[in-house]
Amino acid sequence: MAAARLAAALLLLAAQVACEFGVLRVVSQTSRTRSRDYCILYNPQWAHLPHDLSKVSLLKLRDLSTTQLCSYLDVPAEDFTNQIALVARGNCTFYEKVRLAQGSGAHGLLIVSKEKLVPPGGNKTQYEEISIPVALLSHRDLQDIFRRFGREVMVALYAPSEPVMDYNMVIIFVMAVGTVAIGGYWAGSHDVKKYMKHKRDDGPEKQEDEAVDVTPVMICVFVVMCCFMLVLLYYFYDRLVYVIIGIFCLASSTGLYSCLAPFVRKLPFCTCRVPDNNLPYFHKRPQARMLLLALFCVTVSVVWGIFRNEDQWAWVLQDTLGIAFCLYMLKTIRLPTFKACTLLLLVLFIYDIFFVFITPFLTKSGNSIMVEVATGPSNSSTHEKLPMVLKVPRLNTSPLSLCDRPFSLLGFGDILVPGLLVAYCHRFDIQVQSSRIYFVACTIAYGLGLLVTFVALVLMQRGQPALLYLVPCTLLTSCTVALWRRELGAFWTGSGFAKDAPQTPWAATQGPVPPKAVGSSLSEQPPSEELAKSPLSTEEAGAADPAKDPDNPVASPLSPSNGDEAQPIPVVKPETSA
């Protein structure tokens, strides 16, 4: 399998037009101490550029930037011997230009482009015929060269090597593993709190949203929608990208609010509420601090939306909003069984491989649909990028940093999909009281899978479908732990997560499962929840007794008023009358 994947990767690389950045060193012909570097785009299939500047000779730049060099009539009487030819782009192919330049003795060809730089491509026969480098230079950079140095300059073309490993991978690793661990822990604990005693309700905004259980039908519909949306983005990227940006702003601000709300509710100030009114949402009289939090979250999202293309700092806001969105989704979406986890991960595993490795054979350009959409099509007129990724700029210093500010990317799907399995493992840990062994093992497996992804990225030097490595690592690890503990059957079916209240490490071993809401009537409790298998302890009875709360004037008839141990509460069976 490994050999087949490597062969497929090599085939894909061969099918694409090679494209690399290089550096043009410009030196003044009158003063050799004055120099400046400029970015160029070249195709190494014509000829490779040396990596070391010290091994490159400075050559005179022959300025024919007003000529397109498409016929022998464009070749000057004095040839290009020991010179770098500078010509304009257009009217003929790159091959025709470089063939004429090489025939006239040029040691290299620079093509000035007023449009976006594209790889100077050709075919295999043409590559074998040409032995001099071909590179594109932007018209803006050429104007800067003439302004600074004049038209008499010496130049050298080279392609400095970049470090194989960049430190930004460490940042992405910490963000991804941290999000999965925190999100999985939060999602599991969120389910437990529904069965634990609650503090006095301070207002309507105190209530938390219920988790959404994912069914196999929902999984299939979701994957079909993903495929459909990805294909639409591939063909209509420039129109749909703004829709995705708008959705991200809305969803990320909601996620940020959900993450910060528990901390804001603990603040001792701004607890006043809005006056009585009939306005939507405001009729619930939210607290002033929650309104301020909502305003803050919307402001952060809007600021990112306005300045999203500021490479120097906008990526920090994007990552912050992205992590908040992922945490919110991990808390909200719940996979009820390991069977559902396996189905989702395997289907998306196939989806990821298909759109990364198979689609290059189906598209005219020979490019992967997934990579094109994730990084933005090269022919996009908007040059916008999809925000559904964590992105960190390269931290290693390199001369090539003047060409672009390259980012390393990790899609939200590579966090959310394994994260849902981690969340399920935490809930199962709580149910079987296993000291979180499933949760810890699955989180470690995710981290190891991500490390394998980074290694593959370094070795293959191209984008990797992270789920190709994350899905086997997390699924096999979780299954192995279940087999080792002889709990595979219960782990596979979830053992009634949706029905039974979990026995948590924080509850007494022989104690009861507390009701969902203090003081609720018997008719509100499902018959399947045996609420009173054993008496409440004195501490729990006191905490659950509204009569002992000086702020609550309503006393519950189900709680003793003398502080003694509460008596068991009778359970009404559906087939008998009370």
Swiss-Prot record:
Residues 20-168, 238-239, 308-312, 363-405, 460-463 are lumenal. Keywords: Cell membrane, Endosome, Glycoprotein, Golgi apparatus, Hydrolase, Lysosome, Membrane, Protease, Signal, Transmembrane, Transmembrane helix. Residues 520-529 have a biased composition (Low complexity). The active site is at D352, D414. GO terms for molecular function: peptidase activity; protein homodimerization activity. The chain crosses the membrane at residues 169-189, 217-237, 240-260, 287-307, 313-333, 342-362, 406-426, 439-459, 464-484. This is Signal peptide peptidase-like 2B.
